[in-house]
Amino acid sequence: MGVSDDDRIAAAQSYIDGLVTHNGDAVPFAPGCIRIEQGIKTGLTGNHLRRSLNRGPQYRVIAATTKPEYTINGDEVRAVYNVLTKASLGGRRVAARVDEAFVIPAAADKATIQHIRVRFHPFAQRI
């Protein structure tokens, strides 16, 4: 049957929304989903990632994201967007340009996130 590109993008968007709302309950993680951030494994399982979104202090500083630009290549859904934090100093807010790749197989019965790989580049944004 397969999963549509729109459903795969919606699964990735639910993760990005969870970063801002600090609620990972609606994110369709596969049980064995892992997350690699800047080359380091930071997510061990789907449940671990969900708990991190719900209660992790590392996500509490996130205030908003910009609308992601999505591209799809095979089973990979790539999202490029900015994360805006609550942290600011001297009229500038800490932000980061994020390039995140989600493995969400097209041939599956439903859109579930199998793997996340993220790279980000911090910058200061005028408020």
Regions found by a protein language model. Name each.
Residues 1-127:
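C-terminal and inter-domain tail/linker signature
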